[in-house]
């Protein structure tokens, strides 16, 4: 004879008989329980709404308010910083312009002083050169006069020697010098 196995009763319980204990069908879809289900649904949503309006929504509103306040503070700080940066930039630009103007003034003053100094040196050099030129011209005139005086003597001596050789007697020295002077004024 066959002995019952410990799982034999379990297998019998697995046999499915259609919804005998519930009266047939899926309970949420039974029309007899709709009114109770709708009532519990309204109560659950009411409680959920009450909890959300008293707990969650104020927390979210507080977070949004804090965030908005932080954003406004950050925007105000950014505006203050921008104003500060603009004023610093303006001060920097004014300072830079003043420095450039001062540098231009210094450069112009330096150019003017160098030009005046160069002009003074040029005038001194021109005066020195004019003095040296006048001295040189005086020396040239003196040497030319000395040389011309020597030429006159040499020419007179040569003319006297030539005439003496040609005619055999020495001509008058004053006449020879007068003849030389006449030939020099013609040229």
From Swiss-Prot:
Coiled-coil regions listed in the entry: none
GO CC entries: plasma membrane; proton-transporting ATP synthase complex
Any one GO MF annotation of this record: proton-transporting ATP synthase activity, rotational mechanism
Localization in the cell: Cell inner membrane
Membrane topology: Single-pass membrane protein
Taxonomy, superkingdom: Bacteria
InterPro entries: ATP_synth_b/b'su_bac/chlpt (IPR002146), ATP_synthase_B_chain (IPR050059)
Segments traversing the membrane: 32-52
Main location: membrane
Keyword field: ATP synthesis, Cell inner membrane, Cell membrane, CF(0), Hydrogen ion transport, Ion transport, Membrane, Transmembrane, Transmembrane helix, Transport
Function text: F(1)F(0) ATP synthase produces ATP from ADP in the presence of a proton or sodium gradient. F-type ATPases consist of two structural domains, F(1) containing the extramembraneous catalytic core and F(0) containing the membrane proton channel, linked together by a central stalk and a peripheral stalk. During catalysis, ATP synthesis in the catalytic domain of F(1) is coupled via a rotary mechanism of the central stalk subunits to proton translocation. Component of the F(0) channel, it forms part of the peripheral stalk, linking F(1) to F(0). The b'-subunit is a diverged and duplicated form of b found in plants and photosynthetic bacteria.
Subunit architecture: F-type ATPases have 2 components, F(1) - the catalytic core - and F(0) - the membrane proton channel. F(1) has five subunits: alpha(3), beta(3), gamma(1), delta(1), epsilon(1). F(0) has three main subunits: a(1), b(2) and c(10-14). The alpha and beta chains form an alternating ring which encloses part of the gamma chain. F(1) is attached to F(0) by a central stalk formed by the gamma and epsilon chains, while a peripheral stalk is formed by the delta and b chains.
Family per similarity comment: Belongs to the ATPase B chain family.
Protein's UniProt name: ATP synthase subunit b 2
Native source species: Methylobacterium sp. (strain 4-46)
Top-level taxonomy: Bacteria, Pseudomonadati, Pseudomonadota, Alphaproteobacteria, Hyphomicrobiales
